[in-house]
Amino acid sequence: IICVNNPEYYINEIFEDLTKKNYIIACRTENNLNSYTEEIFQRLEMKSSKYFNAGVMFVDHKKWLKNNTGELLLKQLEEIKEKIIYWDQDVLNSFFDGDYIEISQNINYPINLRWPMDTNEIKHNALFIHYQSNNKPWSIRSVFNKGSSFYQDVSIKTLNRYHLVKTVRRFDLFYLIINTLTFKFLNLKRPLNFYKIALLRIFSNRLNV
């Protein structure tokens, strides 16, 4: 999760709603019940017609404690552990079952680095961006996507270098070669620094550099 614009006004608004209303959490709905998503609702035995993304979740901490929510979630986990696919998100949705305040997409703005994207649109619309799927901005495969710049810009500003995490050596090397041959290195702000870190990471036994 990366904050790209000042969210203060919206966060205050969300917590004001949580305080006034009888809800514990506020989230973005990811799936509504339809013929394509009904498996999720049936698997988790949900009665509601909406399933939220837990990547960005606002919590009324006082209500959470008062209602002993943590302990109840652990009990829910034990009851549905054989049905879980999306880990904590499934447990949370099974427990709250649609009982949450809706937040807009710009507060939990989904990005999938598998696909090209308009970073200007993201800068204009998003408050928090959420890197979904297995394509994370710290992997060699994904750094060539312009969308990874929101994460890597923070690393360059704070560490003065790209932040890369080791995955599988042959895959890292494959994507490094492919993206170089297709000139995607032109998307990089500091290509020499990236290649130095990437090669060190690929040929090192360390998990990250």
Q: Which residues fall in each region the model found?
A:
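Short linear motifs at secondary-structure transitions and domain/linker junctions
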Residues: 1-3, 27-38, 76-80, 102-108
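N-terminal short leaders/motifs
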Residues: 1-12, 45-48, 79-83
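A short secondary-structure junction signal
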Residues: 5-12, 35-40, 67-73, 140-141
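A short, conserved beta-to-alpha structural element at the edge of catalytic cores
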Residues: 20-45, 135, 147-151, 174
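Short amphipathic alpha-helical surface micro-motifs
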Residues: 6-10, 36-41, 83-85, 108-114
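A glycosyltransferase accessory/donor-loop signature
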Residues: 47, 54-209
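Solvent-exposed alpha-helices and their adjacent loops that cap or buttress functional pockets
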Residues: 18-19, 49-51
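GT-A fold catalytic core of metal-dependent nucleotide-sugar glycosyltransferases
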Residues: 1-32, 58
